[in-house]
Amino acid sequence: TIEENNLDWCYSLRQIYDKDGNYVCNDDCESLGKWQSYHGINHIDTNCYCLKTEVAIKLAQVWHGGWGQDRVFLSAMSQYFSKFDCTGEYTVNYKVDGNPGSVNAEFFHNGNKIMNEKYNGVFPWRKI
């Protein structure tokens, strides 16, 4: 996606799995990048990024902070490197319920239901 479209960076979508490794659903509600999540923010999960080396080096310091830096990083990336896109494919496997503070399958089922109603089942981030 980066090379084909002359982008600075891109991101992939997520498939959600439970703690036992069973497929739950696609993430059509949270890590959507250009499109707001069902709770009204733009978000890309840390493991969904693909960056050109020079971009990663220039913004590496943005990761320093703590919980929530993925949101800060997305803001900086969008501001300073605006040539980006979503691959439109669900190529990242994300496991839920890993610890007591983790989101669970219900989070994605509920969020996906809200987004399905909002977009009438036609999600603009999908390219498959």
Regions found by a protein language model. Name each.
Residues S75-N93:
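Catalytic donor-sugar/metal-binding loop of nucleotide-sugar-dependent glycosyltransferases
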Residues Y49-A56:
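Conserved beta strand-loop-helix elements of the APE1-like EEP
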Residues C29-Y49:
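A recurrent flexible, glycine/aromatic-enriched loop bordering the glycosyltransferase active site
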Residues Q15-N22, N47, T87-K118:
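Active-site donor/metal-binding and catalytic loop motifs
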Residues L59-G65:
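Acceptor-substrate binding/catalytic loop of class I
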Residues T1-I16:
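Conserved donor-nucleotide/metal-binding helix-loop-beta segment in metal-dependent transferases, i.e.
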Residues G65-F73:
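Acidic donor-binding loop at a coil-to-helix junction in glycosyltransferase catalytic cores
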Residues W9, C48, G66, K83-F84, ...:
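A residue-level structural signature of the nucleotidyltransferase/glycosyltransferase Rossmann-like core
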